[in-house]
Amino acid sequence: MADTTVEKLATEVGKSVERLIEQFSQAGIKKGQTDNVSEAEKQQLLDYLKKQHGGESAPTKMTLQRKTVSTLSVAGNGGQSKDVKVEVRKTRTFVKRDVSEAVLKAEEEAKAKAEAEAQAKAEAEAKARAEAEAKAKADAEAKAEAKAKADAEAKAKAKAATDAKTTKDTSPEAEAARVEAERLKAAQAEATKRKQDEEAAKAAEKARLLAEENSKRWDEEERQRKEAERYSDHHITTSKVARAAEDSSDMDEEKRGRRARNKNTAKTKRGGKDARDGREKHMRNRSTAPESMAHGFNKPVAAVTRDVRIGETVTVAELAHLMAVKATEIIKQMMKMGSMVTINQVLDQETAQLVAEEMGHKVVLIRENELEQQVLSERDEEGGVKLEPRAPVVTIMGHVDHGKTSLLDYIRRAKVAAGEAGGITQHIGAYHVETENGMITFLDTPGHAAFTAMRARGAKATDIVVLVVAADDGVMPQTIEAIQHAKAGNVPLIVAVNKMDKPEADIDRVKSELAQHGVMSEDWGGDNMFAFVSAKTGAGVDDLLEGILLQAEVLELKAVRDGMAAGVVIESQLDKGRGPVATILVQEGTLRQGDIVLCGLEYGKIRAMKDENGRSITEAGPSIPVEILGLSGVPSAGDEATVVRDERKAREVALYRQGKFRDVKLARQQKSKLENMFANMTEGEVKELNIVLKADVQGSLEAITDSLMGLSTDEVKVNIIARGVGALTETDATLAAASNAIMVGFNVRADAQARKTIESESVDLRYYSVIYNLIDEVKAAMTGMLSPEFKQQIIGLAEVRDVFKSPKLGAIAGCMVTEGTIKRSAPIRVLRDNVVIFEGELESLRRFKDDVNEVRNGMECGIGVKNYNDVRVGDQIEVFETVEVARTL
């Protein structure tokens, strides 16, 4: 085969010349439009195209095994039909034709198509040319005929003219006719040529447009093929096509078989034909389009770390959803951490944070209190940053009976200690006094061990702590605790050494003991100011006040006086006539009657304000303690009190806090530790002392509750089933009767209805005004509930000297009593080489053949052991009795 040019080859394969030159260039062959192409270059181009199209890696043979299961209804016995499952297994082999053959075939098809187009073009041109020639021939014949006719006429005229005028040789009309005939012939030839040129140009333009369209289509197909090769696998595509072909063939065979069975099968059971028709219809309607075999999920190769947003409470299921794990994974993790939880259990924020961090996630703690923040942000302080000096808040702390209230009493020039039950302070007293050098606010805290929380609360709200130490008693446990509270609050400490009027006062001892706990006197090079006072005579009190004001001046205590007030609840109680009453220490701003107060879980509008002396006031500035009325409930001591603008929003915030407090409380109560599981199992064996407790103020209630709960032991548990502030009511009495509880009133009494219920139900009611007595009596009641303890006490010991045989009693041991007394009614043990070998009771005790009840030390006796005959010489018989021992807590 001779070499062809690039242009001719492009025409043969049906591609544009530019595309073919580009493919030659990609194959490493540089060609122009008029260059010749050899067979070797064609083969090189073909190999390159095969490689680019993936022809080398394409599978040449594929075997598919298919299994189809169908149901055939056949006639059975009795005219009934039954379904028989038919399983058809097929193996089909598909052979893919070589890519080169496909390419050659495509080229041959393109070449044949081009040749057909060229042949059609040539035939069209030949047809047009033949038509033009036929038309021209017809015109020529017509012209020749006209010319012959004209010639004949001309000859006739010429002959006539010759006859008439012999001198004239030719006719002018004939010449004109000849010229006109030549002109018409030239015009006809020119029109025919112009028409042929136009038709040829149209055919060439049509061929060019067809070639461009084919080139664009082939380029698009090439681009789509490459795109498909990038995202799919040739084997998968081949498998899909083969499967589609096989599915189509299988369905045709299945339908043909079913039609044949339907014709030949006898009467079937009711509904069989409809079922088969439905199945055939389903098979006919089933899509045979190939489905993708590639899944779209890839297994993660690394752990996914998420930002988990946790609110104040969250359930186990919600936490699992936030971390995108199963709830069982969280339950397993918490079991490893020592907690047993369920899927719906509420977790507090700290627990959820630990679990999420343990599982490798980042935790973002969120506070769901946007409304609360909005309400508090709407507070305005009219004074802005204008700060004014304020009075110092001084807390009097120290051990019980060291003279705290007496010292404050002297300062206030009023008898306060005498009004306290038992001479000890039961709750915080807040007072402000005017001195010559300025005003001072005092907080008097209890010194008893039960009032730890109240002392801590006092240290939290104070500026200066005055530690009262008795000069004759020294440092005591509550003194040390007060020092710890002051250090924890980073509050300056002033030591007031009281009872200096007593002859037993020892100043050096007090300084030395305080120095051991980090409180060093200025005389000894320390930082703490010491004042030596006597609350009885008033000696040194002025020096103490001067030292307090000096310390306050050093601290530069300032606060915003104008604007909305904020403070802290010092004490709260439920008054029978006035309702909830809260003692608030104003810390900033001015508290006025009529203000809306948000106080912990409670809210309300201030209906009345009273100072510590019970006088009504209308406003209170910084460092002033005041009693307010009008709250919705009794707030907890230590809560922050804030004045807000909108009562409706304050109510919403209070309700939100109550709900959140309940959720957090439940979340903490639901914790069940693994180490407590066995204790929980045996909890039913623990005896409980149920108590209904009512107190006059919140602080005393907390102190008594903590003290009573601390009395619980492994055997007796104190269970406070109800507690509150205020008088004992009929509801309390009914609850105590139903739960077999003791009713305890601390500085409160039962009302008339409650007394009737108590009398009718025989409920144990006890009143107390001193916390010592309450704790002691509860402890005595718990002691009576303890299960008795029994102890075995040895009362006698006898040594076997000889053994006698008795026909009635068997072996009789002749013994000498070496210790104590042998009693016939007491149980005994037989010891051999100091090892107990038998435990039982005496059957016979005789002395000189007489039955006796007991034998004393140093006497001989005969002992018969019941159901035991292996008594030997040298054994010891030990007599003991079981004694009940009284138990104490």
Swiss-Prot record:
A GO CC term assigned to this protein in UniProt: cytosol
Coiled-coil stretches: none
Domain of life: Bacteria
Region (Disordered): 115-293
Region (G2) location: 423-427
Region (G3): 444-447
Amino acid composition bias (Basic residues), ranges on this chain: 257-270
Chief localisation class: cytoplasm
CDD domains named among the record's database cross-references: IF2_eIF5B, IF2_mtIF2_II, mtIF2_IVc
Protein's recorded name: Translation initiation factor IF-2
UniProt source species: Shewanella sp. (strain ANA-3)
Encoding gene per record: infB
